[in-house]
């Protein structure tokens, strides 16, 4: 370049214009640009544009819009070129704010956004085209502050003309990845700019909501890498039941963590860290941030781009099935695309882990994506792999036509089920014959003849008539056992809840917990055979300390035992009343939804007597309560038992029916006779037991 410059003195903080001489003054702007890259200046973008003018509209779109469309409005520079973004593949236009939804009950917390500091990621000149290397494990996106400006090469733009140039991801499906980190301390503080922090993560904004929690965008204070962090209130998770056979929603979180810990594939979202402080109410799941958002857009997608996305999904889905995981909620909202056009599967909250066969027994998932066999009122084994393949076909249909194939005319679930079971999809526009054939095989209503993953990989449309083959997977099969699900987080399993666990303030998940008695939230223990044992032992100790109070109730116990005997005799007649209960519930669900797993149990040494409004016994279980066996005969009921230790109230929850029930302790002393109408009943435990734990 022919430039000579003097070295700055130690006390100088930046280059001065007089410290260098340039033989060719045309290079002055370039030197200034380099100087500002190193030491910072607000005019760096203007200098960059002067030195490296836009040569084509495509290059301009890629350079100027990448950093404005990574899902960070507050991280844009002053040159707002959103209106000039002509990227036809819609990768950068999908911000993904609402695409981190997942299958837990909605948390009503609303994020109190603070002003976001200006953080600039400076692009550098595009290098000369080089042969495309073997794909490498993707690193988290990196952002930098004004005081630390680091050039970043813009991601490669994916278009309909170069998508076949990407190498198959199957060859790196087994690449080495460090084990996700587990942290048992959550140190909460404020960043110097006012943003909330947990450990080294600085929270920026909320990306989306799900059931029981939210997802926030954060960056690592030291590395400036971006992450998506799921935040859950463990008390709320523990208190909520998700249906018959499911004790609480915390199991779903444990299962998702266990599955993500095992996953190591380019087309599956990565888990980096789990922060689970036993003294805090919240658990934080640090995941890979996918800046492009959902693959779904408001516009129809070309077959070429849809094929590229579809192949990525097939690779990821094949990997999940090889790992004995059924996703069960495959849909565009759970298929995220990064800036390089790579699709990644996320949200394993309702996923199913199978051992010898892939049979699923419930229809948890989005109704519009349910397979016909899940919508029929039949009791037969259902292949989980076939369910995922059907959802794959519906997702491809959404990509091509920007709508779902089965739409209810009355906004009724039953109408959607009828459309799925009894009607064929329509095709709004002309598509290729190969794609039409693939749709017919993906959306085959007979699960026995529906196309399988191996056939999808060799289909003419997927491979462009064999010119773009999909290679075989090369990876190590890793199974997820039930014990690994229980041990997904290994902590001391009690926390100190806040005074009000139902607060709607968003600060609650990022502020220190107040003092209080243990709420009995359980993770797992290597010595535990059940995730509830620790709470059980504590309850037994508390029960022993309450013997004096219990002795005062002996007379009442004798009367109660007589009532129990009468109730047990009435229980023999309960089957005759089941139909009337179903009619009262006004709930109509597929038979597959009421299939029960027998691994559900509540806490030890507790009896719950539940009667209907005519005082007929519904269930009477003790020692290790398993009312599911009794309620299995009553289709549509959602029985829940979850009472927190030392809390002012807890939830006794139903989804249908009207009941009067007696709640008793392990000595069969009557605690209360209450009525439950439909969905929700707050039950005051302190009033009856003086902080004694009950379930």
Curated annotation (Swiss-Prot):
Biased composition (Low complexity): 149-160, 510-528, 542-580
Composition skew (Polar residues), residue ranges: 161-173, 529-541
Signal peptide (UniProt feature, chain positions): none
CDD domains xref list: STKc_LKB1_CaMKK
UniProt GO molecular function: ATP binding; protein serine kinase activity; protein serine/threonine kinase activity
Catalytic activity: L-seryl-[protein] + ATP = O-phospho-L-seryl-[protein] + ADP + H(+); L-threonyl-[protein] + ATP = O-phospho-L-threonyl-[protein] + ADP + H(+)
Family of the protein in this entry: Belongs to the protein kinase superfamily. Ser/Thr protein kinase family.
Protein name per its UniProtKB record: Probable serine/threonine-protein kinase DDB_G0279405
Species per Swiss-Prot/TrEMBL record: Dictyostelium discoideum (Social amoeba)
Organismal lineage: Eukaryota, Amoebozoa, Evosea, Eumycetozoa, Dictyostelia
């Amino acid at each position: 370049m022919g430039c000579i410059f003097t070295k700055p003195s130690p006390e100088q903080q930046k280059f001065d214009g007089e410290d260098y001489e340039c033989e060719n003054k045309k290079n002055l702007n370039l030197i200034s640009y380099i100087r500002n890259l190193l030491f910072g200046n607000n005019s760096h973008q203007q200098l960059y544009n002067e030195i490296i003018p836009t040569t084509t509209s495509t290059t301009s779109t890629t350079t100027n819009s990448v950093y404005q469309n990574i899902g960070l409005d507050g991280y844009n520079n002053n040159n707002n070129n959103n209106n000039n973004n002509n990227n036809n593949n819609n990768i950068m236009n999908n911000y993904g704010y609402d695409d981190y939804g997942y299958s837990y009950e909605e948390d009503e917390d609303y994020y109190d956004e603070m002003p976001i500091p200006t953080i600039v990621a400076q692009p550098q000149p595009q290098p000369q085209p080089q042969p495309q290397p073997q794909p490498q494990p993707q690193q988290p996106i990196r952002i930098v502050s004004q005081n630390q400006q680091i050039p970043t090469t813009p991601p490669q733009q994916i278009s309909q003309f170069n998508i076949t140039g990407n190498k198959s991801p199957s060859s790196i499906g087994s690449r080495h990845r460090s084990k996700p980190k587990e942290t048992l301390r959550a140190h909460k503080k404020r960043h110097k700019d006012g943003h909330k922090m947990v450990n080294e993560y600085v929270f920026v904004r909320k990306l989306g909501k799900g059931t029981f929690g939210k997802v926030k965008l954060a960056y690592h204070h030291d590395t400036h890498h971006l992450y998506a962090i799921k935040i859950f209130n463990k008390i709320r998770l523990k208190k909520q039941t998700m249906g018959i056979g499911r004790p609480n929603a915390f199991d779903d979180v444990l299962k998702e963590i266990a599955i993500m810990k095992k996953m190591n594939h380019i087309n599956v979202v990565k888990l980096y860290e789990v922060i689970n402080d036993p003294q805090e109410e919240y658990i934080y799941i640090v995941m890979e941030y996918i800046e492009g958002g959902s693959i779904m857009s408001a516009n129809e997608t070309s077959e070429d781009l849809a094929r590229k996305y579809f192949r990525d999904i097939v690779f990821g889905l094949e990997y999940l099935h090889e790992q004995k995981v059924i996703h069960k909620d495959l849909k565009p909202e759970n298929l995220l695309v990064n800036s390089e056009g790579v699709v990644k599967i996320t949200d394993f909250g309702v996923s199913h882990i199978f051992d010898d066969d892939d049979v699923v027994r419930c229809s948890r998932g989005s109704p519009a994506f349910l397979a016909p066999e899940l919508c029929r009122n039949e009791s037969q084994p259902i292949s989980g792999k076939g369910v995922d393949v059907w959802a794959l076909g519906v997702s491809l249909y959404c990509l091509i036509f920007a709508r779902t194939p089965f739409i209810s005319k009355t906004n009724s679930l039953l109408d959607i089920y009828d459309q799925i079971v009894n009607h064929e999809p329509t095709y709004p526009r002309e598509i290729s014959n190969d794609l039409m054939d693939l749709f017919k095989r993906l959306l085959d209503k007979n699960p026995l003849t529906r196309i399988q993953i191996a056939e999808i990989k060799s289909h003419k449309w997927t491979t462009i008539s064999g010119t773009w083959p999909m290679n075989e997977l090369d990876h190590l099969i890793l199974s997820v056992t039930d014990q690994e699900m229980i041990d997904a987080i290994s902590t001391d399993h009690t926390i100190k809840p806040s005074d009000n666990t139902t607060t709607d303030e968003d600060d609650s998940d990022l502020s220190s917990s107040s003092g209080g008695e243990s709420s009995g939230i359980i993770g797992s223990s290597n010595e535990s055979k059940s995730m509830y044992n620790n709470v059980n032992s504590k309850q037994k100790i508390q029960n022993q300390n309450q013997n004096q109070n219990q002795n005062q109730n002996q007379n009442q116990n004798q009367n109660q035992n007589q009532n129990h005997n009468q109730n047990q005799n009435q229980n023999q007649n309960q089957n005759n009343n089941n139909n009337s209960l179903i009619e009262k519930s006004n709930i109509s669900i597929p038979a597959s939804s009421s299939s029960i797993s027998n691994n559900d149990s509540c806490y030890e040494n507790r009896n719950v007597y539940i009667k209907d409004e005519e005082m007929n016994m519904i269930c009477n279980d003790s020692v290790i309560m398993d009312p599911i066996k009794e309620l299995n005969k009553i289709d549509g009921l959602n029985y829940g038992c979850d009472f927190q230790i030392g809390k002012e109230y807890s939830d006794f929850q139903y989804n249908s029916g009207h009941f009067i029930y007696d709640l008793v302790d392990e000595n069969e002393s009557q605690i209360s006779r209450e009525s439950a109408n439909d969905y929700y009943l707050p039950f005051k435990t302190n009033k009856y037991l003086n902080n004694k734990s009950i379930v």
